[in-house]
């Protein structure tokens, strides 16, 4: 017992001593309503060190979860993705992002965790590697042998002009993902780099980008996205999407900047319909970014919605296996609901309605309230059919795991609203779920309760 107490005391002394590190002077962490709010400021290496130090236990948890979950899902161990990240991503990262990742590693080491830059790079690029690079390799060997791997992440909208209450931008997004992953998408990061613009975004522990993509900056740029269902394509010579998305948040000052940054070196991975706004002009855009095809819609008076459906006919035909005519698919069913919402709420859209939209349970196909794959606040764990287009079988534990929204007025003050857990506020409880669905018990090592939380305001504070 005395030895145990001595070890605990020594550990606490070590942590306190490290907390006196001058690199942590401008950093902070606060836990609120299921979220971890962090403030990071300084050079790339300082920002990375602060991130790694403040979120060390959570980064360790996320890395262990991913190694376990990915192996269980696609039968590839972490070493495969490390090798790919080291070869395809690390050499192409701009120096400031390499330095930030190396800083994260140093912060982790200061807390006693032995990960390296390749682990953190693979973590940041895991969606690109698991859902785009791996299918690309498999389909090169045997055509169409690994389709339907592009993740079905998210329901979102952006509106402006006569569609909103004040004529300015309203933007909102909920994250659809496997619950074992999404319940860890619980960081709000306020980043003040020495170069570029201040960023406020959600992310996972260890991410240098948002990942599900909801970000605003102090130049007036804001963006979100929904993934393109059943997209196929990857360019090994391209730049990692996670770096381009971070760069757009840090250096973008306009919609044109965003498009240029995202298109430069496009590797096709994490192909999305991006919803982008500029609070200086209240112009919005929908940027449908495939590998071969890109289409842009722009307006100062309209509402663009997303639920993982592509709109450009050439992109759908040439780069996906998506069926736009299948009304029972999750993307198309949610698209129908979005169309109803747009028609009924034109001229009224504001912050409170945005929160309601992201927690919406009305199944437009069935004409009633339900919890399933067809509603904006998705609950695949309640769906007896499942979401085949995302490779989610019946009752697979996945769906909407959190939501965010902001407006022109809020974004100009670097503020956003966020809700951890289902945006509708429903709890997901692991034990009763596994009792009903033991086929998913293998996820029990990391899948835990996901309690509903209130909408909470976050804002950039300090220098």
Protein language model features and the residues they cover:
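Sec-dependent signal peptide recognition
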Residues: 2-9
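Hydrophobic h-region of N-terminal signal peptides that target proteins for export
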Residues: 10-18
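N-terminal mature-domain region immediately after signal-peptide cleavage
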Residues: 19-256, 263-268, 275-300, 327-463
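Active-site-adjacent segment of 2-oxoglutarate/Fe(II) JmjC oxygenases
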Residues: 300-329
């Amino acid at each position: 017992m005395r030895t145990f107490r001595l070890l605990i005391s020594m550990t606490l002394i070590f942590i306190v001593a490290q907390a006196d590190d001058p690199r942590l002077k401008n950093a902070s962490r606060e836990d609120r309503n299921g979220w971890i709010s962090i403030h990071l400021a300084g050079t790339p290496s300082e920002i990375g060190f602060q991130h790694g130090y403040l979120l060390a236990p959570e980064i360790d948890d996320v890395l262990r979860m991913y190694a376990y979950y990915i192996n269980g899902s696609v039968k590839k161990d972490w070493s495969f993705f490390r090798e790919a990240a080291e070869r395809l991503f690390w050499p192409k990262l701009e120096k400031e992002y390499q330095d930030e990742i190396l800083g994260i590693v140093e912060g982790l080491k200061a807390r006693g965790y032995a990960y390296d830059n390749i682990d953190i790079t693979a973590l940041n690029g895991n969606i690109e590697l698991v859902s785009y690079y791996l299918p690309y390799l498999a389909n090169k060997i045997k055509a169409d042998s690994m389709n339907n791997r592009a993740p079905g992440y998210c329901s979102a909208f952006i509106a402006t002009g006569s569609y909103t209450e004040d004529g300015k931008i309203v933007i909102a997004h909920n994250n659809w993902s496997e619950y074992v992953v999404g319940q860890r998408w619980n960081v709000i990061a306020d980043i003040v780099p020495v170069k570029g613009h201040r960023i406020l975004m959600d992310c996972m522990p260890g991410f240098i980008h948002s990942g599900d993509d909801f970000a605003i900056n102090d130049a007036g740029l804001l963006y979100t996205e929904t993934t393109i269902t059943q997209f196929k394509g990857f360019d090994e010579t391209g730049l990692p999407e996670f770096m381009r998305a971070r760069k757009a948040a840090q250096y973008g000052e306009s919609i044109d900047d965003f498009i240029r940054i995202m298109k430069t070196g496009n590797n096709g991975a994490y192909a999305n319909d991006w919803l982008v706004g500029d609070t200086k002009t209240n112009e919005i855009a929908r940027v449908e970014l495939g590998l071969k095809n890109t289409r842009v819609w722009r307006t100062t008076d309209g509402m663009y919605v997303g639920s993982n459906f592509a709109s450009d006919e050439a992109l759908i035909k040439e780069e996906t296996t998506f069926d736009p005519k299948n009304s029972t698919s999750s993307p198309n069913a949610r698209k129908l609901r979005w169309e109803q919402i747009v028609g009924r709420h034109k001229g009224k859209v504001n912050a409170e309605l945005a929160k309601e939209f992201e927690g919406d349970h009305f199944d437009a196909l069935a004409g009633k309230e339900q919890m399933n794959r067809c509603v904006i606040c998705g609950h695949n764990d309640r769906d007896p059919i499942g979401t085949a287009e995302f490779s989610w079988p019946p009752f697979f534990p996945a769906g909407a795991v959190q939501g965010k929204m902001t407006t022109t007025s809020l974004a100009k003050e670097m503020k956003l609203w966020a809700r951890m857990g289902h945006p509708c506020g429903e709890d997901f409880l692991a034990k009763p779920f596994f009792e009903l669905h033991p086929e998913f018990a293998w996820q029990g090592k990391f899948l835990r309760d996901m309690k509903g939380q209130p909408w909470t305001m976050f804002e950039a504070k300090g220098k």
